[in-house]
Amino acid sequence: MSIDLHCHTRYSDGSTPLEEVIALAALRGVGTLAITDHDTTAGCETALRLGREYGVRIIPGVEISAADPARGGKAHILCYAPAHPERLLPLIDETTRSRRAAMQASVEKVMRLYPISREMILRRAEGSTNIYKQHVLQALMDAGYAGEMFGEVFRRL
């Protein structure tokens, strides 16, 4: 039986709904699965319930986005089974607001460069707590402007 300690769902930038992720884990023999969506614990309670139903041990978690001022780059911190997840909410909320503002600017830029609508992007972000680059790229792929998820267009976004 295997373990996966870093899994994203549609609550953040994953493309698969939570229940389907857990069902696939069970089908593939994953005995323990950590749900670590970006900057949200929104699916954790549901994941614990679904894990019991599918026979998969769920580790609730979150991948917290952070900055590394010393290197001038981004860092992601995985937090597993937080004892007091509510204490993470102020940090998560601040990050979510910041991401939302940045993605609004990105969406505006993409809509100037390509004839796609905000609705196309929002449709791809349905079920997520925010819009991510993957959602924008999925909309561009749907419209035929990108051929692959992490190719040239993704790098330019």
PLM region descriptions:
Residues 1-74:
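An N-terminally biased module of ancient metal coordination in phosphate/nucleic-acid-related enzymes
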